[in-house]
Amino acid sequence: MAYWLMKSEPDVFGIDHLAAMPDGTDHWDGIRNYQVRNMIRDRMQPGDQALFYHSNTKPPGIAGLMEIVSEPYIDHTAFDPEAKYYDPKSDPDKPRWYMVDVRYTRHFDRYIPLDELKQRPELAEMKLVQKGNRLSIMPVTEDEWQAILAMEKEGA
């Protein structure tokens, strides 16, 4: 099992949206970065756990947990001219983009803002808090995962 942090804008698709989906499950589409695509396609597996991170909001931070519940598969939204994430260069015979299905696990007892994550020495090496790392999905080590779960309980 691997751990991930997956970013989404809460006004577009936040943890509340995922929780409200049938069975709390939806596809995580719209990835249009090759490095992130490779992580999805080559490394994500059912059973992996993910932190749901709210980005482009004030303050950005971790809102809760979800689980990867499918094998990676072709992101069909790339082929649909009416879709938000349409990619006119994408070809169904040679697909570029992949996605996975995710299932809501739970909201955190308290929201953990990015500024608080940055203050923790045990998270100093976490990709999220390093300058210049703006990827929408990134791996999380087991130690980082456990530290964040412990932070959730502080002051809750």
What are these regions (language model features)?
Residues M1-P46, E144-W145, E152-A156:
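Compositionally biased, charged N-terminal/linker segments
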Residues G64-L135:
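Aromatic- and Lys/Arg-enriched surface recognition patch
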Residues Y53-P60:
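Short, charged beta-turn/beta-strand-edge "cap" motif at the junction between a beta-strand
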Residues L51-F52, E67:
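Hydrophobic beta-strand signal
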Residues M1-Y3, P46-Q49, A63, W97, ...:
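Short, surface-exposed beta-edge/turn micro-motifs
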Residues D16-H17, A78-F79, P113-D115, I148-M151:
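A short secondary-structure junction signal
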